[in-house]
Amino acid sequence: MIQLAQNAKHPSKKEQKPLVNEQIAFNQFTLIDENSTNLGIVKMENALKLAQEKQLDLVLIAPNPTKPIVKLLDFGRYTYDLKRKKRQAKKNQTIIQTKEVVVKPTIAKHDLEFRAKQSKNWIEKGHHVKFIVRAFGRVSTRIELIEKVFDDFYQLVKDVVEIQKPLTASSKTMYAALLVPLKR
């Protein structure tokens, strides 16, 4: 028999729902009513009767073994509010991308200006820019030429960026710097 392996990138995410009413395994717990008033330590039977009278559910909020906390509320409304909060948090997330500008030390002035203009657009959108200088052969030993290219590029974009990580050698033939938007 062949077994299928689970996808390593996307493992199954089973959302764990809070325990409700009879699912709660504690005999007594701290009960909080729908108005957030602490009713003290209550036995399970009494809490279930109270929940039925008020047509609400018992929901385990804090499953602490020594002091479990259960709240009296409408479970449907509670799950709806949780989903809505999760959706809102996801909508408010901002994703910062790192764009790369790769140049050679012998790049022409116009080409460097074009890359700087492109980088300014990315920075204004809130992205980070990784400036990479690739130097092959004898040019890789001429560090002053590599630093000059970076300085020229920085002079073109310095009004919108700040250097988060200065130009450093990431390998024998590659130098990189990280530029981020100015904090205003």
Curated annotation (Swiss-Prot):
The lineage of its organism: Bacteria, Bacillati, Mycoplasmatota, Mycoplasmoidales, Mycoplasmoidaceae. Monomer. IF-3 binds to the 30S ribosomal subunit and shifts the equilibrium between 70S ribosomes and their 50S and 30S subunits in favor of the free subunits, thus enhancing the availability of 30S subunits on which protein synthesis initiation begins. GO terms for cellular component: cytosol. SUPFAM superfamilies: Translation initiation factor IF3, C-terminal domain, Translation initiation factor IF3, N-terminal domain. This is Translation initiation factor IF-3. It is found in: Cytoplasm. It comes from Mycoplasma genitalium (strain ATCC 33530 / DSM 19775 / NCTC 10195 / G37) (Mycoplasmoides genitalium). Transmembrane segments: none annotated.
